[in-house]
C-alpha cells in the first residue's frame, strides 16, 4: 500500500493535440514547487499527476502544489492493487480515522469504476462498501445529500481510496500563453490583476514607478514584497523600477494641474510598452477598474489606452472593490498591499483631477513636453531586480 497525492487538472484535458505540451509544463511546475523539500517523486500517469509521499502528513507539499496554476484539486490517497476486500477494509479504516479525529457521524461512499473489467458497477461498489462500513462501526449513518465525510473509491489500473479534496486555483500552467508586463503599484489591485493574468498561463514581469526620494525606500520594498508573494505562484519575476520624478516635475511645470494624473499614467504606459517590447512581452497588465478612481472613468481609460499600441489587459475592469479585496486576501497580497507607504501618484496629487479628459486636449498638453527625451532618460536609469521563489 502506498501513500500518494493525486493531482487533478481541468481545462488542460480539453487541449486536444496540445494536451501533452500542457501536461509536461504542469508536471515541470509541480516538480519545481516541491524540489527543495527533498527527494519528492512527481510523475504523470493516465491524465493525472501523482506525488509519492511518505505518509499522509504532506501538508507542505499540498500547500505548494495548490498554488501551481492548472491544478484543480489534490487528494492524499492510498493506492494498492485492485482487490475488493482490501478496498472495503481501507475505506473502513479511513472512516474510522475521520470518526476519531473529527467525530463525524454521517458519511457517503462515492465510487468510480474506470476499469470496466472490474465486475461491480460504481453504484454497486458504493452500496457494498457503505454496508460494510455500517456493519463495522457504531453511531454512523449514511447521508447521501450532505454527509460530513465522503469516502472516494476509484478502481483504475490500481485502487485508490481517499476522503479529502483540497482545491487549487485551476487555470493553465505558467508559460503556456506568452509573456506580459504588469504595472505593479503598491496598492491592492495590481497584484490581483497580475495574478489573474498569470493564472491563464501568462508569464508576468513587473514594472514599478516611484518618485524617489519623495517616495521612500520602504515604499519600494513593499512592491518587492508583493512581487515575492506573486512568485509563490509564478516562480520568478523580473521587477523593473523606474523613477518618474523628473517626468512629474516637468508635467507640474508645463501642463495644467488637473492633468497630472492622466499625463503621468500615459507616461507609465509608454515606458512600460517600450520595455515590454524589448523583453518580449506582448501585453501590458494593469489593475484598473471602471469608476474606481478619478482616472478610471471610461474617458480616462480611453485616454490612457491611447498612449500605447500593445494590448492592455485589465482583468479587474468590471469587478467591485470588495470582490477585488476578497481575492487579494485569498492570494495573500492584501496584508502587504494595505501597509501605509506612499505612492508616486500622491506626490503631485491634483486637487481636482480631470475625470472626463479629451484626448485632443491631453495630446496638446503632452506636446509641451519632451516626451521622447523624458522616456529615454527614465528608462536609462531603470533598475532591474530578479525575484524568485528560491530567494529567501
Ligand atoms: N506607481 C505605480 N507603479 C506601477 N504601476 C502603477 C503605479 N501606479 C498605478 N499603476 C498602475 O495603474 C493602475 C491604476 O492605478 P490607480 O492608482 O489609478 O488605481 P488603484 O486602484 O489605486 O490601483 P492599485 O490598487 O493597483 O494601486 C494600477 O492598478 C497599476 O496597474
Swiss-Prot record:
Matches recorded under SMART domains: THUMP
Enzymatic class: transferase
SUPFAM superfamilies documented for this protein: Adenine nucleotide alpha hydrolases-like, THUMP domain-like
GO molecular function: ATP binding; CCA tRNA nucleotidyltransferase activity; tRNA binding; tRNA-uracil-4 sulfurtransferase activity
Gene Ontology cellular component terms for the protein in this record: cytosol
CDD domains registered for this protein in UniProt: PPase_ThiI, THUMP_ThiI
Catalytic activity, reaction form: [ThiI sulfur-carrier protein]-S-sulfanyl-L-cysteine + a uridine in tRNA + 2 reduced [2Fe-2S]-[ferredoxin] + ATP + H(+) = [ThiI sulfur-carrier protein]-L-cysteine + a 4-thiouridine in tRNA + 2 oxidized [2Fe-2S]-[ferredoxin] + AMP + diphosphate; [ThiS sulfur-carrier protein]-C-terminal Gly-Gly-AMP + S-sulfanyl-L-cysteinyl-[cysteine desulfurase] + AH2 = [ThiS sulfur-carrier protein]-C-terminal-Gly-aminoethanethioate + L-cysteinyl-[cysteine desulfurase] + A + AMP + 2 H(+)
Location of the protein in the cell: Cytoplasm
Binding site for ATP: 183-184, 208-209, 265, 287, 296
Keyword Oxidoreductase: no
Positions of the THUMP domain: 59-166
Domain of life assignment: Bacteria
Pathway: Cofactor biosynthesis; thiamine diphosphate biosynthesis
Annotated keywords: ATP-binding, Cytoplasm, Nucleotide-binding, RNA-binding, Thiamine biosynthesis, Transferase, tRNA-binding
Function comment: Catalyzes the ATP-dependent transfer of a sulfur to tRNA to produce 4-thiouridine in position 8 of tRNAs, which functions as a near-UV photosensor. Also catalyzes the transfer of sulfur to the sulfur carrier protein ThiS, forming ThiS-thiocarboxylate. This is a step in the synthesis of thiazole, in the thiamine biosynthesis pathway. The sulfur is donated as persulfide by IscS.
HAMAP family xrefs: ThiI
NCBIfam families documented for this protein: tRNA uracil 4-sulfurtransferase ThiI
Name of the featured protein: Probable tRNA sulfurtransferase
Organism of origin: Alkaliphilus metalliredigens (strain QYMF)
Amino acid at each position: 500500500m502506498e501513500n500518494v497525492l493525486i493531482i487533478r487538472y481541468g481545462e488542460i484535458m480539453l487541449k486536444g493535440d496540445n494536451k501533452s505540451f500542457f501536461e509536461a509544463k504542469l508536471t515541470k511546475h509541480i516538480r519545481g514547487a516541491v524540489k527543495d523539500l527533498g527527494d519528492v517523486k512527481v510523475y504523470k500517469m493516465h491524465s493525472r499527476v501523482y506525488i509519492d509521499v511518505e505518509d499522509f502528513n504532506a501538508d507542505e507539499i499540498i500547500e505548494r502544489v495548490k498554488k501551481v496554476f492548472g491544478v484543480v484539486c489534490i487528494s492524499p490517497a492510498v493506492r494498492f492493487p485492485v482487490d475488493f476486500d482490501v478496498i472495503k477494509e481501507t475505506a473502513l479504516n479511513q472512516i474510522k480515522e475521520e470518526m476519531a479525529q473529527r467525530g463525524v457521524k454521517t458519511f457517503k461512499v462515492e465510487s468510480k469504476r474506470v476499469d470496466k473489467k472490474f465486475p461491480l458497477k460504481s453504484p454497486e461498489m458504493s452500496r457494498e462498501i457503505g454496508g460494510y462500513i455500517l456493519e463495522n462501526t457504531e453511531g454512523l449513518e449514511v447521508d447521501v445529500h450532505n454527509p460530513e465525510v465522503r469516502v472516494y473509491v476509484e478502481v483504475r489500473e490500481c485502487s485508490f481510496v481517499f476522503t479529502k479534496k483540497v482545491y487549487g486555483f485551476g487555470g493553465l500552467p505558467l508559460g503556456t500563453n506568452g509573456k506580459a508586463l504588469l504595472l505593479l503599484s503598491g496598492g491592492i489591485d495590481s497584484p490581483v490583476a497580475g495574478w489573474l493574468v498569470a493564472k491563464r498561463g501568462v508569464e508576468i514581469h513587473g514594472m514599478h514607478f516611484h518618485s524617489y526620494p519623495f517616495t521612500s525606500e520602504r515604499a519600494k520594498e513593499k512592491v518587492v514584497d508583493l512581487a515575492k508573494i506573486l512568485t509563490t505562484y509564478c516562480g520568478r519575476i523580473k521587477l523593473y523600477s523606474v523613477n518618474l520624478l523628473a517626468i512629474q516635475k516637468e508635467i507640474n511645470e508645463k501642463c495644467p494641474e488637473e492633468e497630472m494624473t492622466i499625463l503621468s499614467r500615459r507616461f507609465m504606459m509608454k515606458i512600460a510598452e517600450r520595455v515590454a517590447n524589448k523583453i518580449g512581452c506582448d501585453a501590458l497588465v494593469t489593475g484598473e477598474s471602471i469608476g474606481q478612481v478619478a482616472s478610471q472613468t471610461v474617458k480616462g481609460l480611453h485616454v490612457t489606452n491611447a498612449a500605447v499600441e500593445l494590448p492592455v489587459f485589465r482583468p479587474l475592469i468590471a469587478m467591485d472593490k470588495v470582490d477585488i479585496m476578497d481575492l487579494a486576501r485569498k492570494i495573500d497580497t492584501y496584508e502587504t498591499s494595505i501597509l501605509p507607504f506612499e505612492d508616486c501618484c500622491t506626490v503631485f496629487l491634483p486637487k481636482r483631477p480631470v475625470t472626463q479628459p479629451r484626448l485632443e486636449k491631453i495630446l496638446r498638453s503632452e506636446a509641451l513636453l519632451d516626451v521622447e527625451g523624458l522616456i529615454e532618460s527614465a528608462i536609462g536609469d531603470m533598475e532591474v531586480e530578479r525575484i524568485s521563489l528560491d530567494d529567501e
